[in-house]
Swiss-Prot record:
Coiled coil: none annotated. The active site is at 204 (proton acceptor). CDD domains: MDH_glyoxysomal_mitochondrial (cd01337). It holds the Pfam family Ldh_1_N. It catalyses: (S)-malate + NAD(+) = oxaloacetate + NADH + H(+). It comes from Caenorhabditis elegans. Its main location: mitochondrion. It comes from the Eukaryota. PANTHER family: MALATE AND LACTATE DEHYDROGENASE, MALATE DEHYDROGENASE, MITOCHONDRIAL. Optimum temperature is 35 degrees Celsius. Optimum pH is between 6-8.5. It is found in: Mitochondrion matrix. This is Malate dehydrogenase, mitochondrial.
């Protein structure tokens, strides 16, 4: 669904809509879902429709949005559902949104890495961000589109160009890494998964995914062998799903759950309920890298406080150190894409 940014912005302008910075009432939050008809978008839309905190769910995609919206609108929850299809309707979809969730893009297939998606998905995120900058510059933007390590810098650079960038309002959704870690740890140790907390820091691809097993709650001891097996399994969990689906897609259902959980956390923050989530954001938590995922405190303005990585083991510190060059490469690729286009 990649269209030139100028095309999207011009289409919005031609529709007679004008840029405003007024956000929806925090008492009646509007959530815009961009890529709503896709493999992640549809189950994510289903979960957002059931979220009692969402007052207006605006669905956007380049095709098939009316059908998804009609289907979801028959669910007996209070969220109003609107459908927006194609670039001429993107502006209305995101206008005055409190939260914008972006799963739009092509999925991984067997043999592909998240970075292989760059050429297609980079353009999609750039073009969406260009319209968001005009229609809803105060929105909290949650980016699911891979490669997240690069697409977050892409969106940020577009917003910088437009003069509306606020680093507290742009997020890479790494919640799935947390969800997977908590599932795998609870399975291994026989914990109640709903009460297991595993912080995951770094980024959202390969060696940049760093589960902090030393910080698991409730406090849990792991053998070196368990750590050496569990860490790469968490890092490669996405590939595990891609291979299991044998060409039929990537992690859509678990990603939808993770996306809905993070969107709900953002909405709760907007409404004044501060909470802590891991997210990939502009951060100085780790020296030598501009974006890094750590636990952050969410509130009315997005990131209220970056909580950092905390006390880590020697093994985890080695993983963090090794992730920095890889993250910098991913970030530079995203920045260069915007500057070169």
């Amino acid at each position: 669904m990649s269209l030139p940014a100028k095309t999207l912005v011009q289409a919005a302008a031609n529709s007679g809509l004008r840029a405003v910075s007024v956000r929806h009432s925090s008492q009646a939050p509007k959530v815009a879902l961009l890529g709503a008809a896709g493999g992640i978008g549809q189950p994510l839309g289903l979960l957002l429709k059931q979220d009692p905190l969402v007052a207006h769910l605006a669905l956007y995609d380049v095709v098939n949005t009316p059908g998804v919206a009609a289907d979801l609108s028959h669910i007996d929850s209070n969220a109003k559902v609107t459908a927006h299809t194609g670039p001429k309707e993107l502006y209305a979809a995101v206008e005055n949104a409190d939260v914008i969730v972006i799963p739009a893009g092509v999925p991984r297939k067997p043999g592909m890495t998240r970075d292989d998606l760059f050429n297609t998905n980079a353009g999609i995120v750039r073009d969406l961000a260009a319209v968001i900058a005009k229609a809803s510059p105060k929105a909290l933007i949650a980016i699911i589109t891979n490669p997240v390590n690069s697409t977050v810098p892409i969106a940020s650079e577009v917003l910088k160009k437009a003069g509306v960038y606020d680093p507290k309002r742009v997020f890479g959704v790494t919640t799935l890494d947390v969800v997977r870690s908590q599932a795998f740890v609870s399975e291994l140790k026989g914990h109640d998964a709903s009460k297991t907390v595993v912080p995951v820091v770094g980024g959202h691809a390969g060696i940049t995914i760093i589960p902090l097993l030393s910080q698991v709650k409730p406090s849990t001891k792991f053998s070196e062998e368990e750590i050496s097996k569990l860490t790469p399994r968490i890092q490669d969990a996405g590939t595990e799903v891609v291979n299991a689906k044998a060409g039929a897609g990537s992690a859509t259902l678990s990603m939808a759950l993770a996306g809905a959980r993070f969107a709900n956390a953002l909405v709760r923050g907007i409404k004044g309920e501060k909470n802590v989530q891991c997210a990939y954001v502009a951060s100085d938590a780790v020296k030598g890298v501009e974006y890094f995922s750590t636990p952050v405190e969410l509130g009315p303005n997005g990131v209220e406080k970056i909580l950092g990585v905390g006390k880590v083991s020697a093994y985890e510190q080695k993983l963090i150190d090794a992730s920095v060059p890889e993250l910098n490469k991913n970030i530079a690729k995203g920045v260069a894409f915007v500057k070169g286009n």
